[in-house]
Amino acid sequence: MADITDIKTILYTEKSLNLQEQGVVVIQTSPKMTKTGLKAVLKEYFGVTPKSINSLRMDGKVKRFRGRLGQRNDYKKFYVKLPEGVSLENTEA
């Protein structure tokens, strides 16, 4: 089952800040997280039931380090639409 430790961070980019005005929060998680798992974590730890969840899988970038090729970790990104007047900032985990 999914756990709160699978959530890496809430993303604060230009695009995600524009989406927050529409009630959408962008969450970065480990690749094994699923929509139903994220929904259960949000309900258990934050007390929030999302209206909808969209997900996409992001491959880690290939980078050079000391002349060798390496790869950053893969992750999943979730776009979570929250009910009106609810945000994850005013809830305590």
Curated annotation (Swiss-Prot):
Keywords linked to the UniProt accession: Ribonucleoprotein, Ribosomal protein, RNA-binding, rRNA-binding
CC annotations in GO: ribonucleoprotein complex; ribosome
BP GO annotations: translation
Stretches assigned to coiled coil: none
InterPro entries, A to Z: Nucleotide-bd_a/b_plait_sf, Ribosomal_uL23-like, Ribosomal_uL23/eL15/eS24_sf
Molecular function, one GO term: rRNA binding
Record text on subunit structure and interactions: Part of the 50S ribosomal subunit. Contacts protein L29, and trigger factor when it is bound to the ribosome.
Family: Belongs to the universal ribosomal protein uL23 family.
Record-given protein name: Large ribosomal subunit protein uL23
Gene: rplW
